[in-house]
């Protein structure tokens, strides 16, 4: 994907690079039959993750810089977007002085981090952990960032220790949206289509999935506060879901491949531009096409509260619940669940190129 994107091709055109690269590899460079899973995940995952990497790297790079500033920016950009760095090296852009692109920065950009303690209920192997949650929001659909793919996107990740380091990665970008109201209205609505990547790894769910979604984003003025909601329908071309604790002798895997769909609802409350409360619920149904199970039902609930303390600092707590119900031909397994709570210190930074911008951004799953 980046081979195309970093050389001037559009989002959709670069997606053909990812598809053709995967197809050539699957059909001509392996001694096994082409894998549908590899085609889907390489193409769609390459598009989602590639576009986010491309836009973040463009923000980091400065084509007018020189000296140590230029070196460190080029190095950071290469870490975020290695293929884009190879393209810049081949063109001589790493050392050339020329104007930055007009769309180097989005209209707004925000970064948030939660550092604290996590307790996992039930029979978790490591119930008590340090945890770090990171999220970034690029663009604002209520400021018109809805016309090109990923003009607005959101990313989030959870890192924990001791134990498995990564327990969550979520990436979500609006492909195209339409404003249904005027900018001056007290209640505003944006409808749109998005592309997503989801990865969860906990006691109840080990899931990786590419997804498309359609929904309505709404923003409400409530006195000095503001609220935002997101109601979404999900379509999942293919998900990988761990359904057994052992390798299936027929597939050699402990996870199954399954397409599916679902719904998600979220709400957030803001004081100024700072989120102070959030809650979300989602449910997904999948039908196994390759694996030991017959179907799966995955659910989640998350709730968070943050209290600003001073400046960029705040404190907060959260509760999460995850569930997986898997059915199998020939035997029964009970529903698996995990609940957890967190206490943390929050640090939030934001910047906007729009005068007077302080409105809440897109609600997104945390």
Language-model region placement:
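Residues on the lipid-exposed face of transmembrane beta-strands in outer-membrane beta-barrel proteins
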Residues: 3, 48-52, 132-140, 171-182, ...
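Repeated loop/turn-to-beta-strand initiation elements of outer-membrane beta-barrel proteins
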Residues: 12, 56, 142-146, 184-189, ...
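Transmembrane beta-strands of outer-membrane beta-barrel proteins
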Residues: 17, 107-113, 148-157, 187-193, ...
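Residues that define the transmembrane beta-barrel architecture of outer-membrane proteins
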Residues: 107, 126-134, 167-174, 206-212, ...
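Detector for outer-membrane/organellar transmembrane beta-barrel domains
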Residues: 110, 205-288
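Transmembrane beta-strands of outer-membrane beta-barrel pores
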Residues: 115-121, 159-163, 195-201, 233-239, ...
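Extracellular loop and loop/strand-boundary signature of outer-membrane beta-barrel proteins
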Residues: 121, 199-203, 247-254, 287-292, ...
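Outer-membrane beta-barrel "beta-signal"
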Residues: 337-366
């Amino acid at each position: 994907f980046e081979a195309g994107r970093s050389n001037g091709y559009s989002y959709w055109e670069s997606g053909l690079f990812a598809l053709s690269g995967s197809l050539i590899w699957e059909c001509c460079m392996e001694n096994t039959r082409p894998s549908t899973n590899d085609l889907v995940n390489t193409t769609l995952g390459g598009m989602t993750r590639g576009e986010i990497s491309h836009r973040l790297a463009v923000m980091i790079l400065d084509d007018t810089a020189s000296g140590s500033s230029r070196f460190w920016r080029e190095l950071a950009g290469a870490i975020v977007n290695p293929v884009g760095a190879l393209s810049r090296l081949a063109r001589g852009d790493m050392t050339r002085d020329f104007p930055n692109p007009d769309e180097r920065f989005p209209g707004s950009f925000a970064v948030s981090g939660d550092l604290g303690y996590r307790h996992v209920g039930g029979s978790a192997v490591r119930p008590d952990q340090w945890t770090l949650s990171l999220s970034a929001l690029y663009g604002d659909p209520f400021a018109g960032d809805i016309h090109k793919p990923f003009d607005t996107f959101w990313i989030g990740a959870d890192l924990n220790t001791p134990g498995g380091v990564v327990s969550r990665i979520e990436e979500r970008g609006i492909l195209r949206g339409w404003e249904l109201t005027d900018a001056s209205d007290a209640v505003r609505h944006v409808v749109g289509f998005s592309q997503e990547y989801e990865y969860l790894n906990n006691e109840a769910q080990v899931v990786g999935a590419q997804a498309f979604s359609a929904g309505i984003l709404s923003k409400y003025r409530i006195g000095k506060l503001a609220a935002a909601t997101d109601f979404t329908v999900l379509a999942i071309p293919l998900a990988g879901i761990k359904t057994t604790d052992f390798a299936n002798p027929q597939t050699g895997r402990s996870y199954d491949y399954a397409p599916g769909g679902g719904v998600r609802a979220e709400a957030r409350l803001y004081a100024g531009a700072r989120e102070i409360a959030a809650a979300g619920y989602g449910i997904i149904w999948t039908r196994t096409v390759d694996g030991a199970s017959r179907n799966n039902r995955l659910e989640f609930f998350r709730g968070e509260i943050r209290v600003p303390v001073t400046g960029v600092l705040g404190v907060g707590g959260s509760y999460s619940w995850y569930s997986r119900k898997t059915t199998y031909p020939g035997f029964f397994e009970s529903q698996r669940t995990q609940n957890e709570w967190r206490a943390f210190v929050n640090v939030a930074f934001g910047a906007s190129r729009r005068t007077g911008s302080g409105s809440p951004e897109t609600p997104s799953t945390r």
